Amino acid sequence: MASPMKSDFLAGSHMKLPKIGIAAAVAVVASIVIYLALSSFFVGTDEFKNDENQSIKEYPDNTRFMRFTHGKQLSKAGEDLAGSEPYLVRNGKSKELVIFAPEHLQEFHRKDANSHYKPENMNMGDYAGQLLGQCVGQLGGTKWKLARSHMDPEFSYRASRSMMKRFSQEIDSWVSHLSENPTRRSTQKDVFVQDVKKRCKDLSLRSIAISIYGETFSEENYAFLSTMNELHEKIIFVAFLNKRVMSKWYNKLPTAEKRLMDSFQTQWKAFNLAQIKLAREKKLSCPAEKIYVGVEAGDMSLPEFLQSLDEMLFTNIDITGSILALIFQHLAKDQAMQKKLRAEISAHRAQPGYTVGDYISKQNTLLHFSLLESIRVTPAMYFTLPECNASPKRIGGFHIPAHTPTIVDVNRLNKNESIWGTEADAFRPERFFGLDPARYRFGFVRWGIGRDKCLGKNMAEVILKLAILAVTDKYTLHVPPALPGQGEKSEAGFTINRDVEVEFRPAI
C-alpha cells in the first residue's frame, strides 16, 4: 500500500495509477538505478571472449596496491597466468584490461584515440581524485583542449630552449655540491659514493620548479616546495594504500587524512596565487602566471590549474629524478659505453660552430639514445594509469567492449622481443642507430602515448641531457660494492623505488 506521502505526491501530480502499476514502476526504476550503478563500477566479463567463446583470463587478487608496491611481481604473475594474451585485473570495484604487446597498443589506439578518456579519479577513489582527479592529464574532450591551449606554449620545444641557460646554471651548482654528504666514502682521494636517486630528485625539484615559476623562483620557494613535496608524498601514500579514503563520505569526516589533504591544498593554492601576484607586480616572466590567464578567461577552473601544476611538479620530480639516476647507474655498469659517450661529446664539441643547444636537440646521437635506452630498460613505472577506449576493440583475439579501463605493462612492452630482439633486457643504446622510430611507435612507452604525451617532455629532455653532460665532464661513474638489502623496495609511489648508488671518481 502506498504511503500517505507517496499518495499525496501522486495526487498532486494528477496521476491515477493502479497500485500494481505503482509497484511495477518503482521496481523498474529501482532495476535501472541498480543496473547503472553496477555498470559504472564493473566491466562485464561475458563480453571478454575470443572467437572460440573462451573467456579472457582474470588475475584473482585485487591489484589496487600491488601494481605500485609489487609491480615486477604482478607483471610476472600476469605473464604466468595468460602468457601472450591480454588479461583482466581488479582495481577495487573496477576491472581493468592489461595489455603489453605492440599489436595490443596499436589496436587500442586505432581510430578512436582522440576520443579516449580517463576513468573518474584514475580508478583510485575520491582521495586520489581530490589531489589529481582534475589535472590536465585526467581531462578529456573540450576541457583537455582548452587547458592544453594555455599550457603547451609554456612547455614547448622553443620554451625549453629559452630556459637552457638557467637550467645549466642550476645543474652546474648541483654538480659542484654532489660530493657533499656522500652515502659512503672511499680510501681514494676525491672518490665518493652517492645515492643518486635522492640527489637527482633534488635537482628535478629545482629544475622543474624553474620551468614553472621562471623568474619568481627563489631559494625560499625551493625550501617551501621541498616541504610541500614531503607532504605530497604522504598524501600519495595514503591515497594508494588506505582503502577508507576511496569513499567521498569518509573524506568528509574530520580525520587525519582530511587534515593532511586540506593542509596541502590550502598551502598550494596560496603559494601559486602569491607567485602570480608577484610576477604581475614586479613584471617577472612566470609560466604559471601566463597559464593562469586561462583561469581568468574561464577556460580552466582553479582546481584544474592547481592540480595541473601539481602534476607537472610533484609527480614529475619523482619520474625525472628516477630516469636521471638510472642513466648514471647504467653508464656506471657499462664502462665501454661510457667511454663511447665521452668520445661522442668530445667530437661534437670539436666541430666548428658547436653549441650545446644544437647538440642536445639532435635525435640521432649516442647521448639521445642513451636516454631512450635507459627509459626503455628501466622504466620509472611498471604500469600506466588507466585509460578508456571509446569504441569496441579486438585485442589479442578477444572482443573488448567500449569504455574498458586499460593499463599498459610498460616493462613487458618496452622489452618485446619482436622489436628489441633476444637481448631486450640489455642496456645497449646503439640498438637505436638505424632503427626507424615508426618501428617502435607502439612498442616503447617513454613520455606517454598519443596526444597525452607528457606536457613536460621537452623540458625534461633538456634537463636530463644537460645533467649528463655536466656530470660526465667532472666525473667518471662506477659501480660501488653492493650493500646487504639493496634492490627494489616495496613502497607505494608513482615510480619504482630502487636503491641507486653510484661511485664518482674525478675525470682525468
From Swiss-Prot:
This is Cytochrome P450 monooxygenase lepD. Glycans are attached at residues 53, 416. Heme binds at residue 454. Gene3D superfamilies: Cytochrome P450. CDD domains: CYP_GliC-like. GO terms for cellular component: membrane. GO terms for molecular function: heme binding; iron ion binding; monooxygenase activity; oxidoreductase activity, acting on paired donors, with incorporation or reduction of molecular oxygen. It is a single-pass membrane protein. It comes from the Eukaryota. The lineage of its organism: Eukaryota, Fungi, Dikarya, Ascomycota, Pezizomycotina. Pfam families: p450. Coiled coil: none annotated. Keywords: Glycoprotein, Iron, Membrane, Metal-binding, Monooxygenase, Oxidoreductase, Transmembrane, Transmembrane helix. Its EC number is 1.-.-.-. The chain crosses the membrane at residues 22-42. Cytochrome P450 monooxygenase; part of the gene cluster 23 that mediates the biosynthesis of a family of 2-pyridones known as leporins. The hybrid PKS-NRPS synthetase lepA and the enoyl reductase lepG are responsible for fusion of phenylalanine with a hexaketide and subsequent release of the stable tetramic acid precursor, pre-leporin C. Because lepA lacks a designated enoylreductase (ER) domain, the required activity is provided the enoyl reductase lepG. It is possible that the dehydrogenase lepF also participates in production of pre-leporin C. Its cofactor is heme. GO terms for biological process: secondary metabolite biosynthetic process. It is found in: Membrane. InterPro entries: Cyt_P450, Cyt_P450_sf, Cytochrome_P450_monoxygenase. Its main location: membrane. Disruption phenotype: Leads to normal accumulation of leporin C accumulated but to 30-fold reduced production of leporin B. Belongs to the cytochrome P450 family.
